[in-house]
Each structure stands twice: as C-alpha cells, then as structure tokens.
Amino acid sequence: MAESNKMKEMPVNKLMVQMGIPMILSMALQAVYNIVDSAFVGNMRSGSEAALNALTLVFPVQMLMVAVGIGTGVEKNALLARTLGQGNSKKAAKVAGNSLFLGAIIYIVCLLFGIFGVKAYISSQTVDPQVISMGTNYLRICCVISFGIIFFSLFEKLLQATGRSLYSTIGQVVGAVVNIILDPIMIYGIGPVPEMGVKGAAYATVIGQVVSAILLFVFHMKLNREFEHDTKYMKPDGGIIREIYAIGLPAIIAQALMSIMVYVMNLILKFSPSAQTAYGLFYKVQQFVLFLAFGLRDAITPIIAFSYGMHSKKRIKDGIRYGLLYTIVLMVIGVAITEIFPGEFAALFNAGASREYFIGAMRIISISFIFAGINVAYQGIYQALDGGMESLVISLLRQLIIILPLAGIFSFFVRGGHIGVSLIWWAFPITEVTACIVGYLFLKRINKNKVESLN
C-alpha cells in the first residue's frame, strides 16, 4: 500500500502499531545512549563516583539539546502530516526546508554555549573540582559536536511524518550500535586508542549521533518523494516559521521544562551528592520507560493530524482511543520491570554509595509511570488538533508548577532530619496524578470543540 493511501485507508489500530513500533524503538534507543554511557563510566577503574555525579549534572543540557531538536521536529511533524493530508506538496517542501534552516540556528546556539557557558553551568551545581572538570570536559564535547543529534531529530520527524518511521529506527539502531562499540574502547582504552575516561564517553556518544544523522539524511533524500527537495526551500519563510512555532512552541517549551526540572532537582538535592547521583541515574531509567510513550506519541500525532486534515472524525476518534490504550499497556510493562528489578539496575550502574537512594527512588517514582504515559499521549493528541496551549499547561503542571514546589517543601523536612530522602520522591506520583486529571478535562473540551464540530 502506498504511504499516502496507508495514512488514509489502513485501519488505525494496525497503522498505529506499524508506525509506533519503529518510533518506540527509536526513542528507546535515544535513552540507551545515556544509560550505556553511565553504565560504562560507573565501572571505570578510578573516579567512577565523581564521573557518575558529573554525568548527572550535565544531563539537563543534553536533554535540552534533544528537546529543542525533537520539539522543532514534533511541531513540524504535525504540520507536515496535516499539509500532506491536504495534498499541498509545495507547502510541505517549504515546511521541510525551513525546519532544516532552524536546525542550523539551533546548532550555532549550542556551539556557543559549549565554548563559553559550560563550566559556569556545572559549577552552579557542585563545588567538587573533580566533578567540575569531568562535567565540563564531557558537556563541551557534546555541545560543540551537537549537530549530529539536532539534525538526526529533524530528519527523523521528516521520515515519520510521511509514514516511514522504520527508516528512522534503522538510523537510530546503527548510531546506538556505534556508540555501544566505541564506549568501552574510548573510555577504558583498547588497542591503539588511549584511555580517555569521561571524554571517551562523550566522543562515543557524538560519533554515534553523527552516524545516525548522515544515514537519515540519505533516507530522507531517497525516500521522501511526496515533496520536492531543493535548497531554495531552506530560505527562511516568515509565514512558515510562524506557523511551525504557532503549533509547536509549546512543545519545545514542554520539552525544555524537563531539563529545567532536572536541573532544579539537582539543586534541591545538592545537600546529598549520593541522592543527587541516584536521582540522575534513576532519571535515565525513567527516561527509557517514558520514551516508549514518547515514541508512541510520535505515531499518535501524525495519524490524528492527517485524519484531521482530511476531516475524518472516525479516524481521529480511533487514533485517540488506540493511542491511549497502547500507551497504558506500555507503561504497565514499564512499572512491572522497574518494580521487580531495581537491584539489577543499581548493579548495572555500579551505584556504590548511591545504591539505596537509587532503589528507593525507583520503587516510589515508578508508580507514576502509568499516569505520566497518559499525560504524554494527551499531549500528542492536543498537538495534532492544534491544542498547543493545552499541551504546554500539562507540561507546566508536571515539570514546574506542582513538582518543584512539592519537592522543595519535602526537602525542607528531609534536611531537618525529620524524615528520609524518600519523601522527596513522593512528589512525582502526586504530580502525575494531578496533571492526568487536568489532561482528561482538556481532552473532553478539545473533542467537543475540534472533533465533534467537523462536518
């Protein structure tokens, strides 16, 4: 079946599985980059505790780079899918070209931060000179060579918007394999390659990302024939850029809020470096689980957006129903794994002094995964139906308005010696349940105003 006919005619439940599985694998493999780095770094011969803490502190900026790339891609994904659903191939070409122009701007910003801002950022979270040195070296490499992850994210969404998510997954798998092969070689030093420690982990990561980006560029040029490829479409078009960000600026802010939340949590936990490291390690496991929901969201959004563009009320409703159902199934599996095997994850990272904090965080915070996954699915639905502001509100509730004040208040009692660090972890389930209730109310309103009103 042709790609355009598939988006129009294939039963939504089958289409979501066919598109969703490659996207889920792709997102999961993005999380693998950070897990693999931490696992190898945690088993270094010396300085592993400081190195793990350093990776925890740099993680918010890594997330922010991914967030801006993916956020720009998600908004362009919805707009491109809707435009193709309307049969407007010329506008689709402009959307694709302008997204690449925006990618170049994003890279320049990351490059400048990598050169001038990294050390000050790391120093704001710790006073340990070894951690500052390791974190600065790692993050500078990731920022200066960030064009790989930025353009991978953009080409990934271009392929997903046309229903070719399998090819984006192939590129991600190749990059992940390169990263996994290079990590022990460059961290520990094997053969002619010298031991580079944390720097080696950074180089392995960015090389894998660059390989993925190159491969997806080739796939995009060869396979995406629904619209023209020409550098003339990269010329900035104010109307297209405004339309992209009218849909997706809330999505970028939502993604960036994840980085802000982790950074502020690092500051809240600054009183205990072991708890700080434990949270950073757990967040990478949590990200792996929630990236399953993000991957499915990236199938939900173009399917519903395409259906919205062709005014198919039935396919929109099917997209909402199956999107939520499949998300819940994935999150139940994630909760089961993290609740049953916390000790095994701690051993993978060689968590050391952070072990008990890590296990405690995993057992408590993983309770929230089901509600967090539903919230992610809600946001994909909102974005497909021009509900960018609703998506932003859910993100603000989850990652700023509720979670940070709660964690800060709970930390006051922990620092006073009244109760253990586990109290802080309970802020996460409370936040996700509250946001899920609000998200359901938003969904009912959008369904009434956007879906039921279609002719």
Which role fits each region the language model picked out?
Residues 28, 32-53, 122-129, 185-196, ...:
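Helix-terminus/linker motif at the lipid-water interface of multi-pass membrane proteins
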